[in-house]
């Protein structure tokens, strides 16, 4: 079963910055472990306002009890509240339609673009523009 979990963290004002960083490092390490076990499927960071620390997570667990154990194992549980939404299959889910996607990868689209160079444009301008775009493409 899959669960969407909104995790909202409120760090105590009295907590030293170095202690917060240590907890965040432990959280990152535990997240990697859960991902390797196939229990943590995805994490997203929604747009945040100043002072917010919120994460959306997609978890796989056999039941609510196992999910609670997984969440309890992730620091900083004492600073965090979790809002859990159990997810069920949707009749239009691509997987149910036989369309499988690699985790983290959506459908791919082939897009053809035609660039028209205005008549009379010097060849050097075209070459420079193509070179600039080639440098930017990996970004």
PLM feature spans:
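Conserved, structured core segments of small domains
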Residues: 1-139
